[in-house]
Amino acid sequence: MDVERLQEALKDFEKRGKKEVCPVLDQFLCHVAKTGETMIQWSQFKGYFIFKLEKVMDDFRTSAPEPRGPPNPNVEYIPFDEMKERILKIVTGFNGIPFTIQRLCELLTDPRRNYTGTDKFLRGVEKNVMVVSCVYPSSEKNNSSSLNRMNGVMFPGNSPSYTERSNINGPGTPRPLNRPKVSLSAPMTTNGLPESTDSKEANLQQNEEKSHSDSSTSESEVSSVSPLKNKHPDEDAVEAEGHEVKRLRFDKEGEVRETASQTTSSEISSAVVGETETSSSSQDKDKDSRCTRQHCTEEDEEEDEEEEEESFMTSREMIPERKNQEKESDDALTVNEETSEENNQMEESDVSQAEKDLLHSEGSENEGPVSNDSSDCHETEELVGSNSSKTGEILSESSMENDDEATEVTDEPMEQD
């Protein structure tokens, strides 16, 4: 639509004393209702917009009948004149183009399209008028007519950047910054296909090798590079050495952790095996100890039984021997007493010879229990010695008789055995 022609029509409308409808301006309102593009400023077509709005409301009231029934109790009833004045007052107070201009132009150009009653039409107009945000005309800056607007929603066309027309929240609101788009898609090769993962891995490995080789270069190589690229070669070399030291530390720590894990696992397995072996060996030892204890107890019992039997046998053997010794000692005492009384005149030499004969005969007869016999013999010797000292001299005849009696006494225990 020609903007110059539109401006001339608006000037003619203002110059006329009697306000009438202009087909050129009606065509402009239809264009705004279809596209949402306001090619001129609000101050230029504000007068005709208010005139058209008032005329449409009056025509709608004359053409539409009054409601026959009572008004809806849930809705506040407002008279037509009061609602009309309220709407016109709001539109007159606008300083810019309301962002609902497209919908308002639709209501002005075709009021009966969606409404049949006057009160509903007025409420629809009031809802679209009671707004705050404003928009600028599309041709005001950059003369860009590529932005399309449908029902308050902006549809950018071929222009890559936003303009003043796209700021639907008014002139004072901040606008988004123009930032370059970052493509998140995979890089495309020359044939149009995305790169494969193998090629990516190969590139990564090459980059790592390059970085490693660069870091491992000596200070002399770094200093040989042009001074424009590397202003501080010493610092770069120190940083490279620090990176290498860190890598070596990480590698050593990883190896130490792996070896520690392996050693711990081996220790655990060996400990488990050792426990099983110790348990089995302890069981075997317990069995062996039990067997040895049983054998030892059996042997001890057998030895105890044998000792008891031996002691019993020896006690049996010792009892008659002791009895015989006691009898012999008693007989000897009685014989010695008798001989001492009868033969007081026996000589000491004869007595000693008789005692020797007695001892020799007793030793040949009793060889087993030597200790007891010897003790008894010593007692008899002492008694005989005491008796011999008391008696004095003994005759040779009495000594011969004593020899015969002694032989008889020694024969008696042999007969008992």
From Swiss-Prot:
The keyword Cytoplasm appears for this protein: yes
Keywords: Cytoplasm, Cytoskeleton, mRNA processing, mRNA splicing, Nucleus, Phosphoprotein
Biased composition annotated in UniProt, kind: Polar residues: 140-149, 158-170, 186-196, 259-269, 385-399
Ranges of compositional bias, category Low complexity: 214-226
GO-annotated molecular function: protein phosphatase regulator activity
InterPro entries, sorted: PPP4R2
Region Disordered, annotated ranges: 140-417
Acidic residues composition-biased segments: 298-311, 338-350, 400-417
Keyword Nucleus included in the entry's annotation: yes
Subunit composition and interactions: Serine/threonine-protein phosphatase 4 (PP4) occurs in different assemblies of the catalytic and one or more regulatory subunits. Component of the PP4 complexes PPP4C-PPP4R2, PPP4C-PPP4R2-PPP4R3A and PPP4C-PPP4R2-PPP4R3B. The PPP4C-PPP4R2 complex appears to be a tetramer composed of 2 molecules of PPP4C and 2 molecules of PPP4R2. Interacts with DDX20/GEMIN3 and GEMIN4. Interacts with RPA2; this DNA damage-dependent interaction recruits PPP4C leading to RPA2 dephosphorylation.
The protein's role, per its UniProt record: Regulatory subunit of serine/threonine-protein phosphatase 4 (PP4). May regulate the activity of PPP4C at centrosomal microtubule organizing centers. Its interaction with the SMN complex leads to enhance the temporal localization of snRNPs, suggesting a role of PPP4C in maturation of spliceosomal snRNPs. The PPP4C-PPP4R2-PPP4R3A PP4 complex specifically dephosphorylates H2AX phosphorylated on 'Ser-140' (gamma-H2AX) generated during DNA replication and required for DNA double strand break repair. Mediates RPA2 dephosphorylation by recruiting PPP4C to RPA2 in a DNA damage-dependent manner.
Protein name, per record: Serine/threonine-protein phosphatase 4 regulatory subunit 2
Organism: Pongo abelii (Sumatran orangutan)
